[in-house]
């Protein structure tokens, strides 16, 4: 599902542990790291997509996490021209994302990257909250900055 402006609705997932670190995942067979994210199907709410993607990409269930916050609006990034599939219709020029800040309430041993036939990640680690800003691919950096900045107060004020 792509909106009239060419952006695909998507959810981004910032999963934290009790130390305030975030789960940082390595794309399969690449030296590229990112937060889990994924598209929102036409029949899903952003929260529905969050739980589906959380399970598909990191093997966690609804009961394994607590939602701490969500960005108020959509955060958008454009794909570099080399990644735009110009021959597909409708044309997708980027993603518009709702970002969720989650806290892991179960054991981290439950994190699994291999539950689907086509895993997106082959490794993960805990990193400091702001670490991803200096590591993510350039075209996603501003969205990461905005999401982390908006959601940070909720992490710092949680009970």
From Swiss-Prot:
One GO process term, biological-process aspect: mRNA catabolic process
Entry keyword annotation includes Hydrolase: yes
Record-listed E.C. numbers: 3.6.1.-
SS bonds (residue pairs): none
Coiled coil: none
UniProt domain Nudix hydrolase: residue ranges: 6-149
Residue span of motif Nudix box: 38-59
UniProt-listed Pfam families: NUDIX (PF00293)
CDD domains in the record: NUDIX_Ap4A_hydrolase_plant_like
Cofactor(s) listed: a divalent metal cation
Top-level enzyme category: hydrolase
GO cellular component terms given for this protein: cytoplasm
Keywords: Hydrolase
UniProt xrefs under SUPFAM superfamilies: Nudix
GO molecular function terms noted in the UniProt entry: mRNA 5'-diphosphatase activity
Matching PANTHER family: M7GPPPN-MRNA HYDROLASE
Function: Accelerates the degradation of transcripts by removing pyrophosphate from the 5'-end of triphosphorylated RNA, leading to a more labile monophosphorylated state that can stimulate subsequent ribonuclease cleavage.
Family, as annotated: Belongs to the Nudix hydrolase family. RppH subfamily.
Protein name as catalogued: RNA pyrophosphohydrolase
Gene responsible for this protein: rppH
């Amino acid at each position: 599902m792509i909106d009239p402006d060419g952006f695909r609705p998507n959810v981004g997932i910032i999963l934290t542990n009790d130390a305030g670190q975030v789960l940082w995942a390595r794309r399969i067979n690449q030296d590229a790291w990112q937060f889990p994210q994924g598209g929102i199907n036409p029949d899903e709410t952003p929260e529905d997509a969050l739980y589906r993607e959380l399970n598909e990409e990191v093997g966690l269930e609804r009961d394994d996490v607590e939602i701490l916050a969500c960005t108020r609006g959509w955060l958008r990034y454009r794909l570099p021209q080399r990644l735009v599939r110009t021959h597909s219709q409708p044309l997708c020029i980027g993603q518009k994302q709702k970002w969720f800040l989650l806290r892991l309430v179960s054991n981290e041993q439950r994190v699994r990257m291999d539950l689907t036939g086509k895993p997106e990640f082959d490794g993960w680690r805990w990193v400091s909250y702001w670490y991803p800003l200096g590591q993510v691919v350039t075209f996603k950096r501003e969205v990461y900055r905005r999401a982390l900045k908006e959601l940070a107060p909720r992490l710092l004020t949680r009970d």
